[in-house]
């Protein structure tokens, strides 16, 4: 072997260098360079503890308390906003309804109980022994019907009207004449007559110039009491025939006539009745005639709306 830096003598064969069998590490995809001291984390996804990829992006898992903290104010704001919208909508609906239907006033006419209903039904059938017909007041406001039997209510007229329609359907069914159209005609005719009565009385009060505290709802209540006698007459007619129908209906007609006279005279003739002055003037005469006409119309309508139901 020759020293370094000296050329090999001529004729000496040159040795062939074979490639070294030492392995050179080759980097595989997904593996770090073996000659690199530190891992390149600029493009690789961050890893949390244990080598698992972290969805948070900073090596820490997202905290559930942070998400709840952010979601709570949003939900509270949504609830407050929704409740405010509901309150505004309710207020708007109440105002629009009160323009046409006095809901607050209607609550007064349905303030009844079982004792009142029983006493009022007895008064409608037997009004002859009742003495005190004046409505009681408390601080210039009439007391609720459940505390005063003389106060008008809408519960009995409404229930009586519905019951009358059901009894009419029963009567038509026993005679093999029932049909939905005929029952609807019965209900619509009863409502039409009631509406006509109210309009006629209000127009008459306007023409006679009567200053009274009788309201439209009071009129509907008083005029609706006649359905109680109509129910009794039709049921008796179904059980005992026409004789029973005429007897019971006649009694109920007289009773409702007396009831209406004694009730309306305190409404239409309130000033004259309070002062005890005899009704002699022309205007008071008209008021008395109006009271008599309203009371007399009740028996006529009671017969007209029920006579065809009993055969």
From Swiss-Prot:
Residues 175-189, 238, 311 are extracellular. It is a multi-pass membrane protein. Residues 1-57 are annotated as: Disordered. Pfam families: YIF1. Residues 48-57 have a biased composition (Gly residues). GO terms for biological process: cilium assembly; endoplasmic reticulum to Golgi vesicle-mediated transport; protein targeting to membrane; protein transport; sperm flagellum assembly. GO terms for cellular component: endoplasmic reticulum; endoplasmic reticulum membrane; endoplasmic reticulum-Golgi intermediate compartment; Golgi apparatus; Golgi membrane. Belongs to the YIF1 family. This is Protein YIF1B. It comes from Mus musculus (Mouse). The lineage of its organism: Eukaryota, Metazoa, Chordata, Craniata, Vertebrata.
């Amino acid at each position: 072997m020759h020293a370094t830096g000296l050329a090999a003598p001529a004729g000496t064969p040159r040795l062939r260098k074979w490639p070294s069998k030492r392995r050179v590490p080759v980097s595989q995809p997904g593996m770090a360079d073996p000659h690199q001291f530190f891992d390149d984390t600029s493009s690789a996804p961050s890893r949390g503890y244990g080598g698992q990829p972290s969805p948070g992006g900073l090596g820490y898992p997202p905290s559930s308390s942070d998400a709840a903290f952010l979601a709570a104010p949003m939900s509270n704001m949504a609830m407050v906003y929704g409740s405010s919208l509901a309150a505004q909508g309710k207020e708007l609906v109440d105002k629009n309804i009160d323009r046409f239907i006095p809901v607050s006033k209607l609550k007064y006419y349905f303030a009844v109980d079982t004792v009142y209903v029983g006493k009022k039904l007895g008064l409608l059938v037997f009004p002859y022994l009742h003495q005190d017909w004046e409505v009681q007041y408390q601080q210039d406001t009439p007391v609720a019907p459940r505390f005063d039997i003389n106060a008008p209510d809408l519960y009995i007229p409404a229930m009586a009207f519905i019951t009358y329609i059901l009894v009419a359907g029963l009567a038509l069914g026993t005679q093999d004449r029932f049909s939905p159209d005929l029952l609807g005609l019965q209900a619509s005719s009863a409502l039409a007559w009631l509406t006509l009565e109210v309009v006629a009385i209000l127009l008459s009060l306007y023409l006679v110039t009567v200053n009274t505290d009788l309201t439209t709802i009071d009129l509907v209540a008083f005029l609706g009491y006649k359905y109680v006698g109509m129910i009794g007459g039709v049921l008796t007619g179904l059980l005992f025939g026409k004789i029973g129908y005429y007897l019971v209906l006649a009694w109920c007609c007289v009773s409702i006539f007396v009831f209406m006279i004694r009730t309306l005279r305190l409404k239409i003739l309130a000033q004259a009745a309070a002062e005890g002055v005899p009704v002699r003037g022309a205007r008071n005469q008209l008021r008395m005639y109006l009271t008599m006409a309203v009371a007399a119309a009740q028996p006529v309508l009671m017969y007209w709306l029920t006579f065809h139901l009993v055969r």
